[in-house]
From Swiss-Prot:
GN (gene name): HDHD5
The protein's name: Haloacid dehalogenase-like hydrolase domain-containing 5
Biological processes annotated in GO: glycerophospholipid biosynthetic process
Keyword Flavoprotein carried by entry: no
Family: Belongs to the HAD-like hydrolase superfamily.
Lineage: Eukaryota, Metazoa, Chordata, Craniata, Vertebrata
Gene3D superfamilies with a match to the protein in the record: HAD superfamily/HAD-like
Amino acid sequence: MAAWGCVAALGAARGLCWRAARAAAGLQGRPARRCYAVGPAQSPPTFGFLLDIDGVLVRGHRVIPAALKAFRRLVNSQGQLRVPVVFVTNAGNILQHSKAQELSALLGCEVDADQVILSHSPMKLFSEYHEKRMLVSGQGPVMENAQGLGFRNVVTVDELRMAFPLLDMVDLERRLKTTPLPRNDFPRIEGVLLLGEPVRWETSLQLIMDVLLSNGSPGAGLATPPYPHLPVLASNMDLLWMAEAKMPRFGHGTFLLCLETIYQKVTGKELRYEGLMGKPSILTYQYAEDLIRRQAERRGWAAPIRKLYAVGDNPMSDVYGANLFHQYLQKATHDGAPELGAGGTRQQQPSASQSCISILVCTGVYNPRNPQSTEPVLGGGEPPFHGHRDLCFSPGLMEASHVVNDVNEAVQLVFRKEGWALE
């Protein structure tokens, strides 16, 4: 990402979490209410919410009680959202409509698929790769996700492994007992899609490396690896994420770190990305802003959405990304949109938003009482940098504008700031 992202820190006010994160609760047996059915608008909003999911609304498959309270404030008596809301998650191993259905069941409020942004959703904008033969890595419905993003010629890691069984050698139980005949009929791979963390990391790491080092023909091999290598598009840079366990779990950012380290060690060169998506990339926030705008148009809200409030639990992805996008909006307002790197902009329509305000909650990754928190260490030292290699570390960008206990308090805070009734 371009170096301008490392400008001085925002003058952000820090909050203090006085209460521990509340215990997660199970599904509420209430029928889902439609969240943005078209209807008459009263006091058209000029702000919208970008809500993280894991650690903000849910922990694993259990809803956080504060999320139910928050949505009772966000939804009016007719079952309509009072303000535009988009759910922005770095999850990617699920279909968009499936995630919407999951949220509907958890929140008791019908969520449509076009309110949900998965980590790889902005790949729809990379149309120059949609006709190329792409190797896709991840788990779950990877083929359906890739095709839904516009990629029409996709091969999975498992399909590649079956075509070239001699490539996957770590698991002794899966090694062939006989040597297969070489294949010359397998079409060359032209790029790599990294949609999310795979299940068998050793297999995916090995085969992705084989594709990159062989210029897309892993059955043949090359004496000298090509550089630049084949295009790589990746989503979800989260090193860690929060589920039901007491400590954070490895995210796709950890897998990317492994791949980058192996490539560097083997070739002596840096793995390069044509696109990095998911929080904290600016591209993801631009995509979210566009969905907020379209949602407001469907509701008939004529006033432009000027403020975005991004609520998350991870200082490195949610807070960093919101603050980075805020800087982008400020710079775009004064100087025009800057040029960015792999996580940069592809936006066609000028941004109407003027600010993106970060709100950090204490129900997920962030916990000030945890010694492994991303808070600055004692003695004035800097916290560990959990962000991606291509993000220039600026500690100030991890400083949230507001820190509250949970998403319900975040909604109350925003409504007070905007002069809206809490109920």
